[in-house]
């Protein structure tokens, strides 16, 4: 295996699925909705609380967002357009099914995302993507999202549960000393696919191999790691 990778971690939005907001913006605009207003609310502090599992779907969409947009806006339409914008990258999914899961390729495949439960469920219902993975790391399960060090530490624990079972993570207190050294050694065995340089930056503290993926350019991944296509 390339660089002794034991685990390949895939971001969902922007990697396995296209970045949904750009598609959603076109649909919102077609209804005459204020795209900037909606987008700002979807990246607001309240939206971050939703991603971290601190508030419910109902509280965000039907109470908070409904109070922030004009009364004639259909909040359910806004939400469904936001979900529909995520399109599966078939280059990646076919590579995962036909190559990475071949007998002899013993990579652990892990999904990660700063996302919300209902959108994950929507994508699962539409694409059945979870069958591609051996494990999943979501912001709403750990109370942190990218680019937080805690989220990366949580991802490493998901990748290597046995090796890290005695390590207790704490929000706002990144690992130090021997525990950090352990996570850095494990990090060398992870290939981390993201579409954002900013979001992937904390992974480097843990010696994780990061690759910035561009939809339609899977060949660049194989150029850097040719053994991944065997």
From Swiss-Prot:
* InterPro entries cross-referenced by the UniProt entry: HAD-like_sf (IPR036412), HAD_sf (IPR023214)
What SUPFAM superfamilies would the database entry show? Answer: HAD-like
Q: Which Gene3D superfamilies match?
A: HAD superfamily/HAD-like
PANTHER family hit by this protein: ALPHA-D-GLUCOSE 1-PHOSPHATE PHOSPHATASE, FLAVIN MONONUCLEOTIDE HYDROLASE 1, CHLOROPLATIC
Q: Which protein, by its recorded name, is this?
A: Putative uncharacterized protein DDB_G0287169
Q: Which organism is it from?
A: Dictyostelium discoideum
